[in-house]
Amino acid sequence: MAPSRRKGGGKAAAVAAACRKRKVGDLVLAKVKGFPAWPAVVSEPEKWDASPDSKKVFVHFFGTQQIAFCNPGDVEAFTEERKQSLLTRRHAKGSDFVRAVKEIIESYEKLKQQERASDPKSAEEGTLGSAENTTLMPQVIEIPTATSLTQMNSDPSHGRDESTLLNEDASAAEQMLALRDNSGPRNKACDSAVVKEPRKIATYSSRKRNGGVRSQNCAPQNETCPVQRSKSPSRLQTEKLQSSMLQNSDGGQTIDDVEDGALRREKRIRRSSGHSESDDVATSSLNSHGSDEENASEIATVESDNNRNEGNGVDSGSKVEQIDIGGKFLEGDYDLNKGLNFQINIMVKRKKRKPTRKRGTSDVVDPQAKVEGEAVPEAGARNNVQTSQNSHEKFTERPCEENGDEHLPLVKRARVRMSRAFYGNHEANSSLQAEERSPKDTVVSATAQTSPSDIISSHDTFAVEESKFFEVSAKLSGDMVNVAPSPVEKSHDGMSPSEACVQTVREREYAMGWNELSKTPDDKSAGPQYNQVSSLPAGEAQTASVPEAVCPEVLKLLTSESDLPAVQYCQVAKIEPSMDPNTVDSSANNASEICSLSIPSQLSGQDRSNDQDACVSLENSREYLNEEGSKIDACVAQVVQSEAIEHSPSSCLVVNKQETENMPKTVNMLLKEGHGSLGEECAIVEPAQCTPNLPISATESDVIVGENVPLNEIGCTKCEDAVEDSRQLKMIGETNDQKQQVQTNNSVLVSENLSREKMSFSPAITADTPARGTPHSSSVYYHISTSESANDMQNNSSGSPNIPTGEKKNDCDAIVKEEEKIETGVCQGQKVVSCDVQSTRESYEDALCSLVRTKESIGRATCLAMDLMKFGVSAKAMEILAHTLESESNLKRRVDLFFLVDSIAQCSKGLKGDTGCVYLSAIQVILPRLLAAAVPAGATTQENRKQCLKVLKLWLERRILPESIVRHHIRELDSHSIVPACLYSRRSARTERSLDDPVRDMEDMLVDEYGSNSTLQLPGFCMPALLKDEEGGSDSEGGCDSEGGSDSDGGDFESVTPEHESRILEENVSSSTAERHTLILEDVDGELEMEDVAPPWGTENCTHTDQADNTKVSNCQLGQQHRPVFGTSHQHMSLSSPPLPSSSPPPPPAPPSQQGECAMPDSYLNGFENGGYRNVHGDQQAGPLRMNPPLSGSTMHYQGPESSYISGVQLTNSIPQADGSNFQHRPYPSHPHPHPPPPPPPPQHQFSFREPGHVLKSHRDAPSYSHRSHYVPNCDERNFHDNHERMRHAPFENRDNWRYPPSSSYGSRYQDEHKAPYPSSSYNGVRWDNPPRQYNNRPSFHPKPHSEGPAPVGMRDPGMWHQRSD
């Protein structure tokens, strides 16, 4: 019997198989609990000092640079489908995830490009297929002659068999020459070829992240061109090296690892001895590990020094040179920092050229200049012709010298032929190339000059508009081409500045056709070259100048992606005669190309406007190139920088905007710091001439136009000066940058697009520096634009601001190297930051749009805001938040957003140091806007106001913001909460009223819910707010506004209304108020005796709660005075009064007797109560109505106004129902009753007194008095009239009788009968169909058994009337 299989055995085997399926370097999506499937790459645990686990897959996550062991089931391969899905869903998952997606996509594209590079056919096809991502390969750009075309056709085989190409010395040289000769056609072809097969310079975009991609892209291009193939192999190797370096930077690998693969590729590429110097140069350049003497060695390593020295390796010379830089750097076992690999590569160890080789000869420049220069001459010549006639003439002379080129080395021969071809195709090619070339390509290094004199020191003209232009920064890198080659080289690279520029322009244009060649080497050496450019900036910047005429072409060139590699190549081609290394050669080639675009105009003395124009077009192209071609620029800059480091101080002088952007080196730092923005900075820092200009331009953001100064004149001193100037610019720029960038913060704002636009021609800067691929200039802008990044800018500054002009080139080189190192880190960091900022900002905006009042949502948005603060854009984050809050229509969400502000503030408060103050200061400045948006004016925002007050009080308690500021805003919110009560009738929203609020019964009445329409009827009468006093119930306040009580809530109203039971009064009424009211009642009792003589109307003086004395005297007098006025007949009054609302009951029948008139019927009281008097009125209403001295029938009419609120007439808006409340609260004396011990006196109000004889019962009270408070001063009625009736005279008196038909007699109201209490039954007056519910169950008046009518308000004691006795 077979043994039973162990349970789970198959599962374990499956797991192991799945683990084995994943290989190191595979791109995957790994799922970790709590996170989405995260982009990662399979790595080796050993590299991270972790013990391997056979059952798990060890991955390194992109974006966060974290590692983890994942189950095989949680790891899935990264495919094209997954790529598309991630692109659509990345923005809602945070900045880290967005960054991770970008990185894995770049790596994915890089791997695909590497595969294509390894397979020439696939590489060529791939490059053609990915035109949008790549710039045209030199081969594509160039339209070779029939031979060159044939060679190009055979290029795939050559690319396939690079070693074969290298071995074919003569054939390769011939091919190179033919290709260059046909560079003009190629340029034309570039126009078409660019479209046909853009080389995978798209890897340049990858280069943004890692230089390896650039080199890889360059490799396919190199394969495309046979002549370039010599470079191509090295390029491929360099690209691989760079790619590995990039991978190392991304994956933490060291350059050594990269070297291994790259060196192997380089070793595979052997150049034949017959290749002559160009081959030797290429080989030497490829032999980055070998010395210059070893250039003849079989291994073709890229060494820019050798290339420069030899100038023989035309194709490989410039390109290989760039590769050399990377190789050298690798060779030097330098560990490339992530994102800084290329820049560090710039630090490539320079190897001494072979003693046999001439540093100053054109040969030095020729290796690169030939390969690149030949392609460039025509392209560059076009530009140069436009820019500088001299350079063009010299260039022309060179071709003449090269007519019999058989005796010339292959490289020189190729150059001569290229130049001739260039002249033929100059016009057509220049336009085509201009279109094809990217802004970076447009950046033309100054002509590679044979000697310092040849080097043209001219400043880059930066677009005066900082935000729009980074004026041909590439000029610097192009200018950095300091070539002291043989006369032939001079014709292209070694020519005098003007000549070099001309030829450079030609080469540039031709090189635009040969951009592949220039790009490839540049790309490969982009990292190192970029660093070289950084080192070169001081010296080569002098030579580099963007010709105005060239600039237009440059603009054209910049327009096309393919141009970018050429420009970069040109920059790399920057070669000084002093620069012996191969980098010089590659720089020379690149420089010539760059010069062709940038230098000629300046050499020809054209205006900066051309440069600026070129910059404009370059900016446009650059935006595109930044995505794809920026890598090329970085490569070029690196090559140039390495050259500058190795060779002359003139390189130190070179400062390109794009280079500064792409190059994290001194130049970039200087530009960044000096100008605050690349656009502001001068691309070129001339040794002596540029020195003064640069600081100015840095401050003024103006384009510094440097004069063309030969390297000979400039010399080391100028290089030193340039370095010094650059440093000064850095220091000056640090301050200016901060200011200017803050000013141009909108344009800079770390937006990749803006940074791309601002980035000048310099390819290296825009392309390589940031591992993220964000334009370096943007990073610079970002840092400069924010004070928070100011420190970074300061750190960017590399050396001391001033360097003695007497210093030697070595000093300059050392300084430049240091600056390059610094700038490399800074630029890359800035690019990464820029990309991070953009993604974080998008995530932040998404979080604001989807914010809800939950801890998770607010916490996530807070974290994103903190991330933005780290990037230095806290002010922008708060601006976005304020804008979102202001544009939010939902009031509830406004509170949510304000809670986010609170979260950010408290989180910032918890931070240590000055970082916590960043947001707090921003919040403090923008807080008024935030509060105005969160709590807009209106009565419907009370909830928002409450929540904001809570937040502010919490801030006050925790001292989040200065106490004075917080208290100020709290007071404002409090005032806003009070104002609406006064401005908008104090009626609370229906939903805010308590269920037992009598207002609910009055909803259909025209009077307000508190039984008064005084607010509507007394427009000129200012009613003070009683929100706070309702509880206190002061007479003055109550008298001021019958609505004062209405403002209060139902409970408040009850507590203030004197009709409430004593328990309520005790709860809500202050003792002092109660005492005061008690005195008033006693006085009122005393005044009841005076009522006989005085009319019941003590109006004027009793408008507000009067003290007892005032009420006694003034009320009586006023009553007498106004008595005749009010003593109109009820009928007359009713006629003049407004009609009753449809819902109001008919007026009550007249009381049976004058006693009835004198006494208020229960129904009247009820009606009055139903009138909805609130606390203010109710303060005195609560007291029993007291009978005043007998009055004529007219007095009954006067009491009518109180009841008129309930009468149909009084219900109308015209009837001031508030009068009733005033009446109740008037201090006017009512019947003195021996019994009525006044209950706890309610708050005094103007309505505390009523008209004598008017016994008012709240509309709310039922007919029975048992539910009402035991007393209310009858003077309330009088007071009622005082406040409101005086405003409305006779017409309102009708209200008094709304329950009583007007009595025929107008005699004294007070008769003997009326002295006796009137039973409620004595009133036949009309009452409401449904007696209003008692207000908060307050007891109504308790009629005495013998009472003939309702007890007067003033006499209302618990359950009984107090009849006045004579």
From Swiss-Prot:
The keyword Nucleus is annotated on this UniProt entry: yes
Residue ranges with Polar residues bias: 213-252, 787-803, 1191-1223
PWWP domain location: 24-81
Record keywords: Developmental protein, Flowering, mRNA processing, Nucleus, Transcription, Transcription regulation
Acidic residues bias spans: 1032-1052
Keyword Transcription regulation: yes
InterPro entries, per database record: CID_dom, ENTH_VHS, PWWP_dom
Biased composition range(s): Pro residues: 1138-1152, 1229-1244
Localization (cell): Nucleus
Regions of compositional bias (Basic and acidic residues) in chain numbering: 111-124, 391-403, 1057-1066, 1251-1262, 1275-1298
Residue ranges of domain CID in the record: 836-977
Short name of one Pfam family: PWWP
Inactivation phenotype: No visible phenotype under normal growth conditions, but the triple mutant plants hulk1, hulk2 and hulk3 show delayed flowering.
Bias-annotated ranges (Low complexity): 1299-1309
PANTHER family in UniProt: HEPATOMA-DERIVED GROWTH FACTOR-RELATED (PTHR12550), PROTEIN HUA2-LIKE 2-RELATED (PTHR12550:SF49)
Protein purpose: Probable transcription factor that acts with partial redundancy with HULK1 and HULK3. Plays diverse and essential roles in the control of plant development, physiology and flowering time.
Name of the protein: Protein HUA2-LIKE 2
Annotated source species: Arabidopsis thaliana (Mouse-ear cress)
Gene this protein is translated from: HULK2
